[in-house]
Amino acid sequence: MTRIDLNSDLGESFGRYTIGNDDQVLDLITAANVACGFHAGDPDVMAQTVALAETKGVAIGAHPGFPDLGGFGRRKLDMTPAEVKNMVTYQVSALMGFTKDHRLHHVKPHGALYNAAAKDLALARAICEGVAQVDDQLPLYGLAGSQLLEAAKEVGLPAYSEVFADRGYQADGSLVPRSQPNAVLTDPLAVAERALSMVQTQSVTAVTGETVPLKVDTICVHGDNQAALALVDQLRQTFTANGITIQAC
């Protein structure tokens, strides 16, 4: 039986600013990547999001990012490996403190940190070492085929291969930058059919037409996407209709 995890980046509101449809999205996903206050979120939002996820039985993961609130963590900052390691440990520990049993299901880096670590092994290793300082058995979610997954293997962390239902792919398996056309997909039916194909064929078609092989353990739909709720709902319907069980990794 085929099983797939559906995850979403949540807890990204802060102060008086509300981002996303967290309450509704949590009814449809199996794992939540919760912002840890650096790129988005704040202590109150972190506490509220964790409590809500626990109530709904959704697996909770830390979503650390660069300290870039103004840029939503989508700008790469020049930091040493030691700084990245400590930054990740800090954020993961902070979110863990809000959980009932002080345990997390996984860690998934955010935005520019995630994308840079997909290609930069030294940066990826620093992230994994930061996670391991908190819990050396805490699983990592990383882009399929990326250096982040390779670093997790080197450091000894469990890892799951992630794909994106609502993002365009380049021929090398990286995501199309948000500044370019076809970077973000919003049509629920098209996204669901594409995701189903990814699961069934373990591959994706790049925006330039190439077939890119990838391993699919978990699928991300972005919570800050205006179509997020409709996308996740359609994904569930499509997977269920095709005999795919939706379950956290």
Curated annotation (Swiss-Prot):
Keyword Hydrolase (UniProt): yes
Gene3D superfamilies: Glycoside hydrolase/deacetylase
Molecular function GO terms recorded: 5-oxoprolinase (ATP-hydrolyzing) activity; ATP binding
EC number from the UniProt entry: 3.5.2.9
Enzyme's top EC category: hydrolase
Function, as annotated: Catalyzes the cleavage of 5-oxoproline to form L-glutamate coupled to the hydrolysis of ATP to ADP and inorganic phosphate.
Quaternary structure, from the entry: Forms a complex composed of PxpA, PxpB and PxpC.
Protein family (similarity comment): Belongs to the LamB/PxpA family.
Protein name stated in the entry: 5-oxoprolinase subunit A
Species name: Limosilactobacillus fermentum (strain NBRC 3956 / LMG 18251)
